[in-house]
Structure formats: C-alpha cells, structure tokens
Regions:
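C-terminal domain-closing interface element
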Residues: 125-147, 250-268
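Glycine-enriched loop-and-adjacent helix/strand subsegments that border the catalytic/binding cleft
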Residues: 115
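Intrinsically disordered, low-complexity regions enriched in acidic/Ser/Thr/Pro/Gln residues
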Residues: 118-120
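A glycine-rich beta-to-alpha transition motif near the start of alpha/beta enzyme domains, typified by
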Residues: 1-112, 155, 161-268
Length: 268
C-alpha cells in the first residue's frame, strides 16, 4: 500500500510526517521509512493524534521502531507540517509532545511559514554550580557605570557559561578563567561594539548547542542591562536562520527555520 509523506529539515535534523493513514504499525513504518539505505531516510517518524485533551499531540518513532522523546526540532517540524497541511489554520497554538504542551508560533512571509518559534519558558540559574572562588567573585564584581559594557558575566544553565563583553580582556585571562570552571564549561566573546539590544557572538570556546549558548548569552546581557542601565532589556541573538529572544521578564523564545525537503510516496 502506498503512503504519501512530507520530509522536513530543521537545524540539519530531518523527520518524516505521513500525509495519510499508516497501512502498518507505526514501529514497522518507522523502520522502513527512516532507513537511509532502503527507505527515505530520516531521524524519526512523527505521528499526530487529535484525541489528546490538551489538543493535538505528537509522537516520535526512531528508525529502530521504538517510541522516543521528541527533540525540539521534531516539535517545530510537527508544527509546520500541521500548518502546511491546513490541519491547523492558526499561527499560534499548542502542540503536546511526551505529555508536555508546547506553545508555538508560526513565522510567515507572504502567507507561507518559513520558521517556528517555541516558548522555552524561563532559564534555570543556580549560583551553586560555581565551584571556583574566583569565578564566584567575578560574578558579583561591581562594574563602573561610566563603562558598563566592559564587564564579565557568569550565568549557569545546564552548563556553566562565561561571557565577556569587554574588548580589553587578554585571551590568556580568558583561558585561565575557563581552566577554573567546572568540566564542560563554555566561554563566549560578545562584540563590545554591537548594540546592547542585539549582541553578537564573536567567538566561542568549546562545543555547545547554539540555542543553549544563545539563551545563556541573551539572559546574561538582559540581566546586565537591568543592572547597568536601570531598565530591563529584551535581547535577541541570531546565527543564520536561528534566533533566540529573551524578554525583560527572562522568558526565552527560540525561532528556527524549518524547510520541506521531500514530498513523495513509498510502498509499505
């Protein structure tokens, strides 16, 4: 039996969305469709149900046929699929995944959606993650009002981050600070000449997820803006077609581009 489908890509991750009823169990369909040698090839198969009391729910199946938690990219792809196929005609709605509702907003140009914004809620910041006395002192160090952008800011999420917004800090000092951080810490240099409302990342030490890094960076700048300028700032960072915005209340929104890559059919 033939199954029609759409394949989407978001941040180099691809997922398949069936456009018709599956002719076989979801596990079997995922194995056949997601196989990159004999099938279409994808990281997962997304199925939707309208029986959830919270609205439409999404379930993700891995290429091995097992049900798996839906990653962020799968949720955004699911939202664009529902909009593209007119299952949902709203640009703002909730989509449940793994029992959790997610607030989504479709970003459109000329009536067509190019990306999806996901409400990530509020950051988890825990001052207790800093094991270094020096790092702890730097976090609470006062900054001169006459030059508020030459500062050092430490913000902790799931991973410790160090953000430098002054251009007068020698690279050796940055390296020594990173050495005092807990394992897995990341350092980033923010452009001191950029608009405080639109900070720009110049360099990053260590591998990290852009969204996590941008969330931490934007939050750091937002906190500094309220402290140094006396008013809370809404801050955005971008990297190509990926955007992160932190509101003055420190609520985080991430916008990622979602592209349709394949529209086709396959016999199952």
């Amino acid at each position: 039996m033939t199954l029609s489908f759409l394949k989407y890509t978001c941040c180099q991750r691809d997922f398949l969305c069936p456009c018709s009823r599956l002719p076989c169990p979801p596990a079997d369909a995922a194995k056949k469709l997601c196989d990159r040698k004999s099938g279409i090839g994808a990281e997962g198969l997304l199925l939707f149900s309208e029986n959830d009391p919270q609205g439409i729910s999404l379930t993700c199946y891995a290429p091995d046929g097992c049900q798996t938690p839906a990653p962020r990219e799968a949720i955004l792809i699911g939202a664009k699929f529902l909009y593209d196929t007119a299952v949902i005609n709203l640009t703002e709605f909730c989509l449940s995944a793994d029992g959790n509702p997610h607030r989504l907003h479709l970003e459109t140009r000329g009536g067509e959606a190019w990306g999806v914004t996901l409400d990530l809620g509020y950051p988890r910041m825990d001052a207790g993650i800093w094991s270094s006395t020096r790092a702890g002192l730097l976090r609470h160090q006062p900054y001169p009002r006459e030059n508020p952008r030459h500062r050092l800011t430490l913000v902790g999420f799931d991973t410790p981050y160090l953000f430098l917004t002054g251009d007068d800090t020698p690279p050796a000092d940055v390296a020594s600070l990173i050495g005092e951080f807990p394992a897995g810490a990341t350092a980033a240099l923010l452009d001191p000449k950029a608009d405080p409302l639109s900070p720009r990342l110049l360099a990053v030490s260590g591998e990290t997820d852009f969204t996590h890094l941008a969330c931490a960076a934007a939050t750091a700048v937002t906190i500094c803006g309220e402290r140094d300028f006396g008013v809370p700032l809404a801050v955005s960072l971008s990297d190509g077609n990926r955007y992160v915005t932190v509101t003055p209340a420190l609520r985080i929104y991430v916008t990622l581009e979602v592209k349709e890559s394949i529209r086709g059919e396959m016999n199952l």
